[in-house]
């Protein structure tokens, strides 16, 4: 039986999750010191300070680790994938001859953070592949950004001779779309899932500017760095504008109404811009815990397996 999804739907989940979203621990004095430095030196040496700011912006503050292992982690076929000058840690479950579902994790996370999707998908005949992005988990490198993550994703898709579906969380969503639009626009994904999709790159950068109280000269130089790395205008790095430029069969967006890391605005705009998109809205599961909600998991598996 074919499932029918509304264009925008609320998920009435009864799952009770008392855990708090993990948030970085930045001391107030550390932030004040950084703000003073960027405000003062950013006016005198805008280009140099913009480079320092970009280094901070593109460097994960920690590498996610597991405090203990479990059956899913232990059952993975783990290997090192050579990407550019780095070794990328890849986790594979199931038969790679079956339809591939790629898991693209978020910023400062790791591939196995999305392992709750492995068992149900493998049991239904899919092969699930996850990876630690450059500078994350057990992969090499110290810095990352959307184009680097997108090139990693593209290389993995080519390695598997294409994939059927993908589940992205936050930063992983941006990498998936960038891969399809700018790295190799011949690639296609039939079933694409976005969990807590981030907003426009420009808006993310503006939030960073606000946090460090960046002066105008530093902002201008920072944008120049980003545009040079991407070889395009900052305004063109925008998932909401990508619909006509990517080959995606169906898109399922899942976002919490009270996500205070990446607000729901982007998901609401995308679902109206993309004809083949549906939006499932949750309440009370935040930015990180939404991925582990069992009701969300069921809907994602149903979406991927529905023909």
Where are these predicted regions, by residue range?
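An N-terminal hydrophobic leader/cap segment in hydrolases
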Residues: 24-81
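Conserved alpha/beta-hydrolase
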Residues: 111, 118-140
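Hydrolase active-site cap/lid region
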Residues: 183-233
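Short beta-strand/loop motif that positions the catalytic acidic residue
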Residues: 246-247, 252-255, 259
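Conserved alpha/beta-hydrolase "acid-adjacent" motif
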Residues: 260-266
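Catalytic histidine-centered segment of alpha/beta-hydrolase-like enzymes
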Residues: 285-295
